[in-house]
């Protein structure tokens, strides 16, 4: 089952290739295996409620999503991928009021204080249920980003405990932020006989660093910044804070279900890129919200996407690609200026039974191969932009 084909890049400086993923990696000779392989999940959004629709009318399969995640985990384990990237929204915001959406809460649990919020809640239990579904994957680490839907159910502190996101408090700031990196030091598979390999660094961004969600209305400077951004750019705010009605083009990103990246995180990102360059590593950037304005619907972009994009372009000699979720239909663009690939992955939530939507990514020295399952589009992304930067790094 395939969605409409992604737009292919048109920049003549780079090769244009697209391959289907019908060939199994198990048939590939040992010396012709990718250096790294990992799994990708996006927008599971499980909730213990009947199937429904988004606010714009798209069908959503809340309970099937959990079973699709279970199948994906078994498949990831079978192929022994080195890690799995969850691009956020592991549960749906409707967990906060399941009875409104046709779900039920056991009367005994109600009497014990079980509700739509708090430490004893549907949201907490729903995340536990999805983590149990993913528990069959044991070959490597499960790297989580978080999105708006997690914050409709849990605090950042609770998410840190549940998802092992290493939230920190920035200097001179008591507010939690959840950006981090993870390095695969050794290739899982030998790619060729010359032994020329590199370490792979995953840089996981917190795109809800500046936002309204789970930030104290009285004391949070980040919430204050979010309030000022939305007040300036969206006349629907605050009465209809999630509405882009009347907004045009890129301005449609200024809604409350999005967020931004604060200065300390931008500085951290720059330092992480410098470190990768100095150590001869290559980088894949992961975030819930998309970074490039042509890689998804504009209503899903990071508020200050341009600040992040500027850093990515500066270090395009090390950045292979940027992967995100949030925009459920998916999308893709190759940045004309840098050659970096920006891919938004299709949501698991919107695939009906028996379709299970997720992806494998195989990392070769000269290309990334996305092997899409279900409604996830497959493609091959050439890494010839790395070749074009050879000898020019010292000028940056």
Where are these regions (language model features)?
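Active-site glycine-centered loops adjacent to acidic/histidine catalytic or metal-binding residues
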Residues: 43, 88-89, 147-148, 205, ...
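Short, solvent-exposed loop/turn segments at secondary-structure junctions
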Residues: 48, 93-95, 99, 292-295, ...
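N-terminal active-site segment of His-dependent metallophosphoesterases
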Residues: 2-123
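Short acidic, glycine-rich surface-loop motifs adjacent to enzyme active sites
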Residues: 273-294
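Histidine-centered catalytic micro-motifs
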Residues: 285-291, 320-330
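Extended active-site neighborhood of metal-dependent phosphoesterases/phosphodiesterases
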Residues: 11-14, 28-30, 56-59, 95-277, ...
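Residue-level marker for buried hydrophobic side chains located in beta-strands
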Residues: 38-40, 84-86, 144, 285, ...
């Amino acid at each position: 089952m395939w969605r409409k084909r992604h737009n292919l890049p048109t920049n003549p400086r780079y090769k244009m290739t697209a391959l289907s993923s019908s060939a199994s990696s198990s048939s590939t000779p040992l010396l012709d295996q990718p250096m790294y392989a990992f799994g990708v999940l996006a927008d599971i959004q499980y909730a213990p409620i009947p199937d429904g629709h988004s606010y714009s009318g798209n069908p959503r399969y809340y309970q099937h999503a959990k079973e699709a995640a279970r199948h994906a985990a078994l498949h990831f384990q079978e192929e022994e991928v080195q890690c799995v990237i969850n691009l956020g929204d592991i549960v749906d915001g409707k967990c906060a009021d399941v009875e409104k959406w046709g779900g039920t809460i056991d009367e005994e649990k109600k009497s014990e204080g079980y509700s739509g919020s708090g430490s004893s809640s549907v949201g907490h239990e729903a995340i536990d249920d999805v983590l149990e579904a993913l528990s069959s994957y044991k070959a490597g680490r499960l790297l989580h980003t978080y999105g708006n839907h997690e914050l409709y159910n849990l605090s950042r502190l609770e998410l840190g405990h549940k998802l092992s996101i290493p939230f920190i408090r920035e200097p001179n700031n008591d507010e939690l932020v959840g950006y981090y990196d993870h390095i695969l030091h050794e290739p899982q598979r030998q790619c060729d006989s010359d032994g020329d390999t590199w370490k792979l660094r995953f840089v996981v961004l917190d795109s809800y660093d500046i936002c309204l969600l789970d930030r104290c209305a009285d004391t949070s400077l980040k919430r204050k910044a979010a309030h000022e951004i939305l007040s300036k750019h969206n006349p629907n705010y605050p009465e209809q804070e999630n509405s882009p009605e009347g907004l045009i083009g890129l301005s449609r990103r200024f809604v409350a279900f999005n967020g931004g990246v604060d200065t300390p995180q931008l500085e951290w990102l720059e330092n992480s890129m410098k470190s990768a360059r100095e150590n001869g590593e290559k980088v894949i950037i992961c975030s819930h919200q998309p970074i490039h304005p042509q890689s998804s619907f504009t209503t899903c972009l990071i508020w200050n996407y341009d600040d992040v994009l500027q850093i990515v372009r500066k270090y395009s000699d090390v950045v292979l690609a940027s992967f995100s979720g949030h925009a459920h239909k998916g999308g893709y663009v190759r940045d004309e200026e840098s050659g970096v690939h920006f891919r938004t992955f299709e949501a698991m939530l919107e695939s009906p039974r028996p379709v299970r939507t997720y992806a494998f990514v195989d990392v070769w020295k000269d290309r990334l191969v996305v092997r899409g399952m279900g409604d996830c589009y497959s493609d091959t992304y050439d890494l010839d932009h790395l070749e074009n930067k050879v000898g020019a790094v010292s000028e940056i």
